[in-house]
């Protein structure tokens, strides 16, 4: 029988949260607030957040590690052989909503799930990893999108040439608003149910994705953060943030599962922007920078 080294993953994830928060605090000159919470049914987490900042208008970098004694049938519907096992789930997730409309919003998540072997049974722990990172710009800059995707490709290529194209396509398909017929942003990479290469190789790939976040995103922040903007550009940012809200509340599996299963609402909704706006049948002026964004919201080869 084989046991998954949960403590190694826990140590990596808490270190990743610390590293990202420290880098963002250094970049923005503002401190994250810490909210430590416990889950009555088992486990808890640490939420690090900023609201009303100058660089980051709203941001959350969250770590959670929750566990239970019996995997509920709803969670094992596609793996009925796991029903009744004890389980653990842990991960780091973040969403950053900058104030300047020229700085893109971004999202990153890395996570692991383990269903433990039952005592007295000839079986192994069952694990899988998932995660990804993606970019949601409000104004279209090709060099930003290419940089983000090039870092994603460089993170995955050492693990196999097939990973980046596969995970990039998965991201394009997942972060898609069917009713708007557009992607949420310019994508990135997204994966789930990763365990086939074995624990060590799967965990190494997860670390590569988590470690890619800062080099993928911070150079874009530094490039755009001092770009002057007007209230009209802030209004367009709020309008596009409305699409972010639509995706999260209508399509995002993690948000829907969390809200429907009695998850921690404050953590789940920390992904929401501080302000969003809807306008009836509004269209940007032809040839405007706002209109140019539409060309970024369909799948493209960036790297």
Swiss-Prot record:
Taxonomy, superkingdom: Bacteria
Catalytic-site annotation from UniProt: 107 (proton donor)
Keywords from the UniProt entry: Cytoplasm, Heme biosynthesis, Metal-binding, Oxidoreductase, Porphyrin biosynthesis
Residues that, per the record, bind a divalent metal cation: 97, 107, 149, 179
UniProt-listed HAMAP family: Coprogen_oxidas (MF_00333)
Function: Involved in the heme biosynthesis. Catalyzes the aerobic oxidative decarboxylation of propionate groups of rings A and B of coproporphyrinogen-III to yield the vinyl groups in protoporphyrinogen-IX.
Protein name: Oxygen-dependent coproporphyrinogen-III oxidase
Annotated source species: Bordetella petrii (strain ATCC BAA-461 / DSM 12804 / CCUG 43448)
